[in-house]
């Protein structure tokens, strides 16, 4: 079961391996493309449902081995409620795949956005128009070109730098709390948040037999112990687990930064996260 499948390309991959696919795509303009894509791989019979409903109104009594919700869940006002809703579609031992804009990692995108916004203000340019894209290319395209990516620079500019929905971030700790309430545990992530088994004897399977909440708690502590490595995308020596005080300070800073970029006043002063800057 996949919500918001767009053209259904990912679902086609699963269907090519024999999966029966149920798709929920509220943009009905995409339905012909979805059917066409399944016809191309000769798997139209594997497309068991193509619904025009939104996640909010979709109903089905069937349970699924795999539920996929990518690209929008964190932007919904009642995302906690809908997380529980999609969890209820899972069979026992089923897998839920989501993605989200991380409430800490987004700091670097926000800094780029605020640089672009200030440059636009100084030049009398609309932040969300094509002239803004031209300035963004001068600032960021060179570094962007070095990345392994699936979208072009204009798409990234539109989706991330100037998009108000980019401020709708989520945090691992909040997702794990929701997982506990649905008896789910974090199985894997990209990047890898759980490094608990990287530097110990491979037979020490620490999480075997534990409750979902215990596994999630263990994962969160591992995440804190490797926070700088995740944030800066490289291996760093972190002597101790990052404290809740530092995380809260950084969280407040990022939230205010996001609000000021997309909804607020650039002239308003934002206090620097001093305790976090100590780690830099």
Where are the regions that the model predicts?
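Conserved SAM-binding loop of SAM-dependent methyltransferases across substrates and taxa
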Residues: 7-18
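Conserved SAM-binding loop
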Residues: 34-35
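Conserved SAM-binding strand-loop segment of SAM-dependent methyltransferases
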Residues: 42-54
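A short SAM/SAH-binding and catalytic strip from SAM-dependent methyltransferases
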Residues: 65-78
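A short glycine-rich, Lys/Arg-flanked "PGG" loop and its adjoining helix->strand segment in the class I
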Residues: 80-92
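Conserved class I S-adenosyl-L-methionine
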Residues: 95-137
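Rossmann-like AdoMet/SAM-dependent catalytic core
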Residues: 151-280
């Amino acid at each position: 079961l996949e919500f918001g499948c767009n053209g259904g390309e990912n679902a086609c991959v699963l269907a090519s391996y024999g999966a029966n696919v149920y798709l929920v795509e509220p943009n009905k303009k995409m339905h012909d493309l979805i059917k066409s894509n399944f016809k191309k791989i000769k798997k139209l019979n594997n497309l068991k449902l193509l619904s025009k409903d939104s996640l909010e109104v979709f109903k089905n009594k069937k349970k699924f081995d795999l539920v996929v919700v990518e690209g929008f869940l964190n932007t919904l006002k009642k995302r906690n409620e809908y997380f529980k809703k999609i969890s209820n579609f899972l069979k026992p031992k089923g897998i839920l795949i989501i993605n989200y804009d991380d409430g800490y990692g987004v700091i670097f995108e926000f800094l780029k956005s605020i640089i672009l916004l200030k440059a636009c203000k100084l030049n009398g340019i609309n932040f969300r128009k094509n002239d803004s894209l031209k300035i963004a290319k001068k600032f960021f395209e060179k570094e962007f070109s070095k990345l392994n990516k699936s979208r072009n620079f204009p798409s990234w500019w539109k989706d991330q730098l100037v998009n108000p929905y980019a401020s709708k971030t989520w945090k691992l700790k909040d997702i794990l709390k929701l997982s506990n309430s649905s008896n789910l545990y974090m199985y894997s992530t990209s990047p890898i948040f759980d490094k608990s088994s990287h530097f110990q004897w491979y037979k020490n399977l620490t999480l075997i037999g534990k409750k979902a909440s215990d596994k999630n708690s263990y994962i969160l502590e591992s995440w804190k112990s490797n926070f700088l490595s995740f944030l800066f995308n490289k291996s760093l020596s972190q002597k101790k687990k990052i404290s809740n005080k530092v995380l809260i300070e950084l969280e407040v800073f990022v939230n205010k930064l996001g609000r000021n970029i997309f909804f607020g006043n650039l002239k308003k002063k934002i206090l620097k996260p001093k305790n976090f800057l100590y780690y830099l």
